[in-house]
């Protein structure tokens, strides 16, 4: 039963957040019943060295338990390097095209597959992958069970 609830939560959460991105106005909502962030209210963090920004939406990815994080890969061929996470992660592409590669050979030009808006991706725990954006920003909703860490791996040439 617990596994069914967890699966249901992972499937419904992206729909809720996708709906939040499409809201144009929401006058008169009771904050005891509903809280929300419109797209222009997302407090994106600074752009990191790989070219991504993030904002924690729910939970704390550094601690045990469920979390959801917005991640924005900025355009301009910005990619993470090959790495893995200890736990499965579930990703919905909300905007743009996200490019995903697997394995220790880093080759953004020939080794990636495009994931357009609406795509759902599972990064399985302890499996090497890398990802990013090419010619447009890519906004993602990443969900999982913390703690969420990343372990870099040696790249193959």
Label for each model-derived stretch:
Residues 74-77, 84-106:
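Glycine- and acidic-residue-biased ligand/ion/polar-headgroup-sensing regions
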Residues 80-82, 100-101, 123, 128-134:
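Short beta-strand His + acidic residue motifs that chelate non-heme Fe in jelly-roll/DSBH
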Residues 2-15:
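Bacterial N-terminal signal peptides that target proteins for export
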Residues 33-35, 128-157:
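Double-stranded beta-helix
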Residues 62, 104-126:
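Short acidic-glycine-tyrosine-enriched beta hairpin
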Residues 18-25:
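C-terminal segment of classical bacterial N-terminal signal peptides
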Residues 67-85, 124-126:
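Conserved short histidine dyad/triad with adjacent acidic residue
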Residues 25-70, 155-157:
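A short, N-terminal "cap"/entry segment at the start of jelly-roll beta-barrel domains
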């Amino acid at each position: 039963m617990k596994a069914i609830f967890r699966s249901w939560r992972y499937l419904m959460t992206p729909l809720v957040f996708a709906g939040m991105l499409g809201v144009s106005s929401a006058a008169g909502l009771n904050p005891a019943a509903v809280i929300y962030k419109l797209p222009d209210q997302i407090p994106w963090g600074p752009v990191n060295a790989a070219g991504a920004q993030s904002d924690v939406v729910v939970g704390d990815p550094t601690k045990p338990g469920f979390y959801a994080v917005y991640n924005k890969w900025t355009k301009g061929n910005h990619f993470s390097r090959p790495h893995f996470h200890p736990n499965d992660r579930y990703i919905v592409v909300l905007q743009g095209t996200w490019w995903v590669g697997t394995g220790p050979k880093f080759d953004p030009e020939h080794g990636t597959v495009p994931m357009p808006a609406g795509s759902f991706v599972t990064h399985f725990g302890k499996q090497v992958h890398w990802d990013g954006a090419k010619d447009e920003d890519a906004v993602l909703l990443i969900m999982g069970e913390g703690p969420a860490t990343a372990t870099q791996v040696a790249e193959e040439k």
